[in-house]
Amino acid sequence: KNLEQIEVFHDSILEIEMDRSFDLTLIKTVLIHINPEELDKVYSRLYKFSNKYICIAEYYSPSPVEVNYRGHSDKLFKRDFAGELMRKYPDLDLIDYGFIYHNDPVFPQDDINWFLLMKK
């Protein structure tokens, strides 16, 4: 397929620096693996790199919780990532959200909540 209009950056969200922004920034099942002490830096980058939309697709928990990940601790963290981002940047509006179900016969994935935010 021709993906000329899509630009993918294969880099660490903790290290990438650029002076560009995009119509949409998307992060999926990455925030759950970021040390909570580094989240503010990641939120800043997601916001900075977006002209208009931010889409977050992650495991959700109303309060922060650490989950054992394949026998390891300090590797998976669930929380309300979208809520935290909206509190940090009050000009973000929640315009849509949904749930991806692991037993979906057409598009199976993990049980993930997604949130589409828009800058005012």
List the predicted regions and their residue ranges.
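Class I (Rossmann-like) S-adenosyl-L-methionine-dependent methyltransferase catalytic domain
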Residues: 1-20, 34-120
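Polar, enzyme-active/binding microenvironments
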Residues: 23
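ABC ATPase nucleotide-binding domain "signature" loop
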Residues: 29, 33
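A conserved beta-strand element that flanks and buttresses the S-adenosyl-L-methionine
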Residues: 26
